[in-house]
Amino acid sequence: MARPRTDIAPRILLAARQRFLQSGVDGSTLRAIARDAGTSIGMIYYYFPTKDELFFAVVEDVYVKVLADIGQALSPELPVSERLHRLFERFASLRDDEIEVLRLVAQEGLLRSPRFERLVTRFLNGHIPLILRTLLDGTRDGVLDGSRHPIVLLLATAGLVGPPQLIRRAVGDRLPVPGAPSGKALAHELVDVLLHGIAPRRVPAE
């Protein structure tokens, strides 16, 4: 039987996301989530059989949209360099709800919760193969160093695509050196670092 279309499920997801951020998944009660959502525990169980399923729904509600954008950004018809720029630009424009879900995922990883394994499985069937395919195309085309293990390339990309943007946004103007790029400008700088490193470029002798 199809469930009726109402705004209850989105309200539950929003309330759960905020509660999970505040108290963690294990520290949040369905009673508190129901109260925040203006509904009953029974309605939560109607849509989400367990608290863990509610957590995964909170993640998936945001992740599926990000995944679609990543898939579009990394379209194999595009040159690898352009794909990387588009990927980094997408992470430069993360919305608040997307950052909140990233925080939830990070919390689960730090706590080494059983839920994290399911998240890893989801990501291994989601954005990770899309990014890895782009990097392998880059080694084939000579854009990236094919002598390096593909997972090294993947980890380097992961380290540059998201964390610097989050740190830059959190620190704001409190950086010790003025004029630091942000947003898309920072994204392009980070792609350049990924492709060329931070050592000074050598000018060929004439």
Model-identified regions with their sequence ranges:
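N-terminal intrinsically disordered/low-complexity leader segments
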Residues: 1-7, 11-14, 18, 170, ...
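All-alpha amphipathic helical-bundle segments outside canonical DNA-binding/catalytic cores
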Residues: 82-85, 118-123, 140-156, 184, ...
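C-terminal peripheral helix-coil segments that are non-catalytic and often amphipathic
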Residues: 90-93, 97, 125-141, 156-206
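Amphipathic alpha-helical segments used for helix-helix packing
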Residues: 96-118, 167-173
